């Protein structure tokens, strides 16, 4: 009921609106508008024919009439109603580079504004001769729409076709120049027509003099050369009485205060009467200001005596960068012209603006008179409004008098910043990966290092994330010095003292680096040591992170924010909510990924969430909830000279209320009008300028779905997850550019590395769209709800590229998990919908599976109106989703004989995979592939080039699509294919990206061409300059085969990307792919648990008793024969998925069902679980069955904790030499038996001198970066050379006979967990992996290394009290630990029985009550109260499966996590912690290179 009431309040709020700063009342939100569907008949075909003979087929959605004209392209991302009504397109057939057109339908084309001008259009109707698009949205949705685009075109008798490869057309025009063309329908032949021979200006100009703004004080004559309506609006708005005159009107004798010439189409030289009239003005004594726009610039230049020329491909779009020559300011402009002025300006005139990219003239000015003109459109619509100020300058000229020039009235630019002189820069990384802060910072940090090295600046990198690429110590792209240390003020201060950097970069290390930098600033450390923060200042960072300062800053510029209060207590939070009214949203200051945030429908929820939030921060913001509004993001770049560009705008498919990290996101935005797009863009730039951001930042908006009302949600003054997504979506290297800007380099001087020719001062155009979908692993966390909200829960994400929404969307869904077919009503991983499913609740309460609930609702014939009401998802997206399911229904009615080429092609165009189609047709995937290829249906390879094909690309950043007609690249490299890791998830994270990058770099160093396939936008491996060809694509059998055969690759490396590519080994091998390294057949034998165990028996290699089971009875019988506990393991899984230690018959039933669901095609193996054993990892490289490189590390924890969650020690600390020799011997036998050539990992149990094999993975493991960096030998470099048959120098490798064992240091790898984000999850370690990241540190001994590693995970050394809760069986071993902690001065608290035992053994302890018994004994304090008031700042909780206080222990653990208190749940880790605290009172700041230098010195 509470949820229903909350939903009702949200809807009521959305309908009636509430008070925002500077927001006017708006119309009520109508949940949907009816889309107009075309008649269900076959679309009429037509062709676009070019004068060079090119002929392309398409389908009509406009008027079915043939037409001829000049074919041009526009690279703008929005505003098609404004674009097609621009008079400058008269006589032209317009090609839209934006692939999806018609999303918002058409506005009321009869509506007029207060001036009598068309309200939403730029003229009195459509001016293009024809329209060419790739994909047309037959179903539209926008609150201003009254009809479809197709209907409008038909009304005005304008032909339009879709299904055209518009990128191919653009490239033809780019390479051959603008050319004539025609849209032809069957039976309607037309001849080519050259509109440039016609006086198009005369055709679009008014025939009569018209007056607008009558009675206004300033008289402006506007010469209509095809003037846009918005020019007139802007003039009248500034107080002009506008006299609009025909192009050939003699205005030379008219009285006016200023004259404006604007338009227009065609060849300006044909407008001779106008040129003569302007010449008279220029040569007369009249000095009233003259302002020319677009054609007005050309006419003014011709009248002055200059010449014009026809451009080869014209400048038409919304992202053209121009530079003001007089003050070096750069602007992004909208343009639409095919002619330009040459360099023949006479004396007295000079250029005013120049195009940054092609150096063409963009404006002229008279040196002594008030005459000026610009080639671009400052009045825009569609496009950016950055240069609208020129209208103000024009009016300033009028007011100032006649004897002045334009330069005297232009806005004064910000002072030009000088280059920042630094010689050494400290870059702070983000530390280990956690939810909300993942691999995107490895990518951004790596880019920053590269940028610094290009500018000859030395770099010191501080980051304990040993699995990251950026922490490599050797390589051309690496930092000069790397510190594996905690990112805390204490350690950073020590590094500053030692390294003496003069610059500091905070924006590349996420919230960790930002918060640390702010604290260093507050402590005065940066000032004391003379360290400059590069890029955005700390003051600006604080203004975005402190919620009150942020609110105050926005109010200074009257920007729109939700009503809010920054508070520092729960009491004040409750008061704020009462003032604002529920529901409210709370947000934490200095927090990441929405941590500490949530929607509070009532007082109780607010108390609960604010209590948890204040455990992490000292300030929260209580604001009005805007749940249900659209969430829009902009990535903004600003340099120190105040040049600004918005690199990407993104739209969350999920509405406000779901954290953007957990939302499906598309780029560019798909449901915004030009007015909405530009309003938010302009606001973004205003805010970024006001806050003083220098570099890159992300700004998030809530936009009302049926009005222009918006509010700013937050600004991230750093690189973020969205930044990485925007970089990969556009090809614009944001982190690299931001790092250059931090050095004071202005944007116009930075090259666009993709084109190699153009400037980085531009806004990318996309002729494709991308979809990002999060990857969750919530099933792994017992007790965690699948519901998602304002606090992020996803552990990774994928990004798919397509040319239709459906294609991009379905690809992205499949990328998330191999079990996902696409957009279907079926749940992933073979799960079933519950029999009591409440579908409406599933839709109204966002969850990790809601997208499938939407599919089910559509499949169940729920109306889209109802789905929209329940989800707040824009109906345009729902229309597209419905189209996918309609196609599935169509396919299910067909078979291989009845399937037509057209239907199969359409299915592929909207993202259906072969596997998906095969299930509909009742075929195998191989049969569907054969059917498709027989019909000659294959994908096309397209480039991402940042400029929608306007300029050639020098990089090979690629994707695959069925929406095309040609490839963008050739395929003569025959490179080596390397498969990446796919989305980050539990068990597969940045360590596998490190492996892939290491392999790629080795291949390139050996002179091999590389072809990389991956779909993860957070990775370094998807940085296009890491390889020769990057395919941002699915890691599926179908797509890998497509690419492999198209490229004719020399082979495929599958062993460096984790389990996803490893699982493809056998299917790829069976389809003729040459798998490099270990045979796929051997991989299959090792992955199948039963076969592998049988091989070990043959080899006489010891393992625990085992049995492959297929039924519950077999499992129960085995358990009975060996006694519980048993270990249950499925095959072909990563990170212990569905792996469990089973202690009882009930658990066996439960866990066996889960394991068989996860691994349906392979048996489940049961082994006897050996208690009290230590686990040992063997990471190795084999060559033809011989081990040539190895490292042995030891787990701190006893067996039972997944290796990914274990704390690793290298070298081993407690393992006997005899046991190590047995480990080596078993490894030797396994390598030989499986003929291993490449990387592999074997896990062992060691108890005393007994050694048992657990499992073997014939691929790289997650510990490869750790052992490689610790030993100074890149295991993947060695493995790659082995796999491709290169010679390997074994003399310096750690072979089994000659190991490399560090003598002067110990390395500790510690796991990173994200328990605070996983509400209600039990933070205890099991066989199934739960950690999200890892860190590693080094010390002279185990204790200093361990403390550094623990501190790097965010662990805080306790200062006050420690709560001890241990199960009775731990007591004998724990007494010494308790004594050590007491002797170190900690006050000990313990549950009653444990307290009695400690006191009886002379260890003072204060008894406390179990949570379930609180209040029963007044003399016992409440554990939860002691934790929350800070009396306890460490919790040690050591339960086992036999404890009767299961729930109480869970409550204690959860309370600690929710209160931000460190928690230890493993005895061995607790013991090591107590020893470390006792023995390492002061932790040094030495890192790996210090110990290496010491070892080298000793050796010398």
UniProtKB/Swiss-Prot annotation:
Task: List the SMART domains hit by this protein, alphabetically.
Answer: CPSase_L_D3, CPSase_sm_chain, MGS
Q: EC number(s) on record?
A: 6.3.4.16
Q: Where on the chain is N6-glutaryllysine found, per UniProt?
A: 55, 171, 176, 207, 210, 214, 219, 228, 237, 280, 307, 310, 402, 412, 453, 458, 527, 532, 553, 728, 757, 772, 793, 811, 841, 856, 869, 875, 889, 892, 905, 908, 915, 919, 1074, 1150, 1168, 1183, 1224, 1356, 1360, 1479, 1486
Q: Where is this region: Anthranilate phosphoribosyltransferase homolog?
A: 39-218
Effect listed in the UniProt record for changing residue 914 to H: In CPS1D; significant decrease in protein yield and enzyme activity
Task: Reply yes or no: does the keyword ATP-binding apply.
Answer: yes
Q: Where in the cell is it found?
A: Mitochondrion; Nucleus, Nucleolus; Cell membrane
Activity control summary? Requires N-acetyl-L-glutamate (NAG) as an allosteric activator. Activated by glycerol in the absence of NAG, whereas in the presence of NAG it is inhibited by increasing concentrations of glycerol.
Q: Where in the sequence is N6-acetyllysine found?
A: 55, 57, 119, 157, 171, 182, 197, 207, 210, 214, 219, 228, 280, 287, 307, 310, 412, 453, 458, 522, 527, 532, 553, 560, 575, 612, 630, 751, 757, 772, 793, 811, 831, 841, 856, 875, 889, 892, 908, 915, 919, 935, 1074, 1100, 1168, 1183, 1222, 1232, 1269, 1291, 1356, 1444, 1471, 1479, 1486
Swapping residue 174 to W leads to an effect described as: In CPS1D; uncertain significance
What would changing residue 958 to P do, according to UniProt? In CPS1D; significant decrease in protein yield and enzyme activity
Which residues are listed for N-acetyl-L-glutamate binding in this entry? 1391, 1394, 1410, 1437, 1440, 1449
Q: What stretches pass through the bilayer?
A: none
Describe its membrane topology: Peripheral membrane protein
What happens upon changing residue 438 to P?
In CPS1D; almost complete loss of enzyme activity
Recorded catalytic activity of this chain's protein = hydrogencarbonate + NH4(+) + 2 ATP = carbamoyl phosphate + 2 ADP + phosphate + 2 H(+)
Query: What are the record keywords, sorted?
Result: Acetylation, Allosteric enzyme, ATP-binding, Cell membrane, Disease variant, Glycoprotein, Ligase, Membrane, Mitochondrion, Nucleotide-binding, Nucleus, Phosphoprotein, Repeat, Transit peptide, Urea cycle
EC top class, as a word: ligase
Transit peptide where, by residue?
Answer: 1-38
**Entry's Gene Ontology cellular component terms:** cytoplasm; mitochondrial inner membrane; mitochondrial matrix; mitochondrial nucleoid; mitochondrion; nucleolus; plasma membrane; protein-containing complex
Span of domain MGS-like: 1355-1500
The Swiss-Prot or TrEMBL note on domains reads: The type-1 glutamine amidotransferase domain is defective.
**What name does UniProt use for this protein?**
Carbamoyl-phosphate synthase [ammonia], mitochondrial
Give the originating organism.
Answer: Homo sapiens (Human)
Q: What broad taxonomic lineage does this protein's source fall under?
A: Eukaryota, Metazoa, Chordata, Craniata, Vertebrata
